[in-house]
C-alpha cells in the first residue's frame, strides 16, 4: 500500500543557531515518506547557506529563498504552493520534532478518517535544548472554538485547502498570524482532534515570532482575520469593539428568568 506523503512546511529567518537541530530531527523520523520544504525569508546570518549544505544528499529536503524579506505570512502562503503532500504540517526552523512525530500523527489520522486536523502536546525547550516545561493541549471542543488556537504539532489533510480560503493574503503585513488564521478556517468547517502525546519541541529563545504578535484587540487587521472572526463568534464578542455582546432582556424574558414559586 502506498504510504502518504507528508509535507513539512518550514519558514526560516535568521535561525542559523537552530536550523541544523530542526533538519536533523526531520531526518531522524521513523516515518520516511516526507518532504521538508524550507523557504528562507531573506536571512542575513547564514541560515539559507547552512540549510543548503544540510540538504545535500537527501532529495526529500528542498531549500528555496525569497529575494527579499516578505514576512512569515507571505512566506507560508508561498510554501503551501510548493507542497505536494497528502498531509501538511507546520515546522518552525528553531524547533524540533520527536523522532516518531509523523508516524504517530498518521496512525491517529488512520484511526480517525473523518478528522481533518490533529494537534499534539508539546514541550517547551530552552536555547540549549533543555526541557523547561510540558504543555498539554486542551481536548478539542467544536462548541468552544475561542478556547483553541494553533497548537504544535499541527497536521492537516491537504484536501481541506480546496474548501477554505487558505493562507490569508490580507494578513501579509503581519508577522505571525497565518497559523491561527488557517486553524480557525479548518476547524470551523471540519472535525479536529487532539493527540495527547508530546511530539514537538518548541524552542523559547526570547526572539520568537509568536511573542511579537499583536493581540486581537490591538490588531488593525482583525476585521480581515479568520482567527478573530471565528473567535468572536464562538465567544459572543463584537469583532468591531472586541468586547462581549450585551444581552438585553425584554419584560417577558425577565419574567421567564424569575424563580417559580
Predicted features and spans:
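N-proximal low-complexity "stem/linker" segments adjacent to membrane-targeting elements
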Residues: 1-25
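Cell-envelope/extracellular polymer assembly enzymes that use nucleotide-activated donors
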Residues: 4-7, 35, 181
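Short, acidic, metal-binding catalytic loop of nucleotide-sugar glycosyltransferases
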Residues: 24-33
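A conserved acidic beta->alpha catalytic loop
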Residues: 40-49, 68, 92
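Glycine-rich, basic loop-to-helix element that forms the pyrophosphate-binding segment
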Residues: 66-83
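Short aromatic/hydrophobic "clamp" motif used to bind/position activated sugar donors
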Residues: 88
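Conserved donor NDP-sugar-binding/catalytic core segment of glycosyltransferases
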Residues: 100-132
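Conserved nucleotide-sugar donor-binding catalytic segment
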Residues: 141-223
Amino acid at each position: 500500500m502506498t504510504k502518504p506523503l507528508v509535507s513539512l512546511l518550514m519558514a526560516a529567518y535568521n535561525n542559523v543557531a537552530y536550523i541544523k537541530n530542526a533538519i536533523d530531527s526531520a531526518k531522524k523520523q521513523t516515518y520516511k515518506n516526507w518532504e521538508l520544504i524550507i523557504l528562507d525569508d531573506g536571512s542575513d546570518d547564514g541560515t539559507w547557506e547552512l540549510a543548503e549544505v544540510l540538504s545535500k544528499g537527501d532529495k526529500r529536503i528542498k531549500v528555496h529563498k525569497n529575494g527579499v524579506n516578505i514576512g512569515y505570512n507571505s512566506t507560508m502562503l508561498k510554501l503551501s504552493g510548493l507542497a505536494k503532500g497528502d498531509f501538511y504540517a507546520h515546522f518552525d526552523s528553531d524547533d524540533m520534532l520527536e523522532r516518531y512525530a509523523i508516524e504517530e500523527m498518521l496512525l491517529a489520522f488512520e484511526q480517525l478518517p473523518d478528522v481533518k486536523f490533529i494537534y499534539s502536546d508539546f514541550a517547551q525547550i530552552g536555547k540549549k535544548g533543555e526541557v523547561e516545561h510540558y504543555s498539554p493541549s486542551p481536548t478539542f471542543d467544536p462548541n468552544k472554538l475561542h478556547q483553541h488556537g494553533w497548537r504544535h504539532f499541527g497536521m492537516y489533510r491537504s484536501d481541506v485547502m480546496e474548501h477554505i480560503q487558505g493562507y490569508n493574503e490580507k494578513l501579509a503585513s503581519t508577522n505571525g498570524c497565518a497559523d491561527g488564521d488557517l486553524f480557525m478556517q479548518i476547524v470551523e468547517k471540519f472535525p479536529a482532534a487532539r493527540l495527547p502525546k508530546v511530539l514537538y519541541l518548541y524552542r523559547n529563545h526570547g526572539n520568537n515570532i509568536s511573542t511579537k504578535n499583536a493581540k486581537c484587540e490591538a490588531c488593525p487587521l482583525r476585521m480581515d482575520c479568520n482567527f478573530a472572526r471565528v473567535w468572536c463568534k464562538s465567544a459572543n464578542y463584537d469583532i468591531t469593539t472586541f468586547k462581549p455582546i450585551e444581552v438585553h432582556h425584554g419584560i417577558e424574558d425577565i419574567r421567564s428568568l424569575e424563580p417559580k414559586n
